[in-house]
Amino acid sequence: METARRDSIDFFLGATTPAGFKGYFEPLRHEPGMQMYLIKSGPGCGKSTLMKRLARAAEQRGELTQRIHCASDPDSLDGVILPGQHRAIVDATAPHVVEPDAPGADEVVVSLYHTIDAEKLHQCTDEVKALFARNALLRSRAARYIACLLYTSPS
């Protein structure tokens, strides 16, 4: 995880629990006057890179910046909040899917799907599907391990 600056706050808004992944973006969405930008795209399409650049630019302007780190990859960002502007930009894809309640009014969907090289991915369809299935299996396994740690008392 990058070193925090004085003008930034770093935290998580989600975690793997015994019941699977739990995200806590709802309170942020319902903060009065908050404008949400919901980024939609596949893995590796630049969502976190975009948010890191936005956070860095805001910090260079002297703005307080809140970075929401990814629970499964703390070097990645799931969101950036700019409290002074009442704006937030979040990764709105699985496992923390966020859909707009008031598109255009409170939330703006930012699609980065055009950055996907669909032709190249299509050539590897079986491998891509296998990797997504493996990811789901490992997330489920992690949830079971956490449940064992929490609910199994030492003998």
Language-model regions: role of each:
Residues 50:
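Hydrophobic positions on the alpha1 helix immediately C-terminal to the Walker A/P-loop
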Residues 39:
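Hydrophobic anchor at the beta1->P-loop junction of P-loop NTPases
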